[in-house]
Amino acid sequence: MKYHQKDIVEVNFLFPDGTFKPHPAIIVSNDQLQVDEDGMFYLVLITSNDWLNPQYSYPLSDEMVVGFSFSKPSLVKCQIITGNIERDVVRRLGTIKARYFNEIVDKIVDSIF
């Protein structure tokens, strides 16, 4: 398995207008899911767009991440989750620290359920 939970990866996200745009994302599903589901994992979108549905956003800063720095202020959009497989990943960017990852998961649960 090449990618793991907490990894920040770049993928092409499909938007409602049918276009694709590369974005960083955090792998939120556990590694066992990839094994059980033939390599599938779930990602949550990272963006610098802070105007759309801010109530579902979790702000990120460089100190929350290992191995990567954001070029702009960035947020996790906790309501935007996709299922992907390894071939969808353009590249691995870094890893989110465990403490912040757990806060993001809590925000996802609050945002969706």
Region spans (language model):
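C-terminal terminal-subdomain/extension
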Residues: 1, 65-113
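Short, charged beta-turn/beta-strand-edge "cap" motif at the junction between a beta-strand
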Residues: 14-18
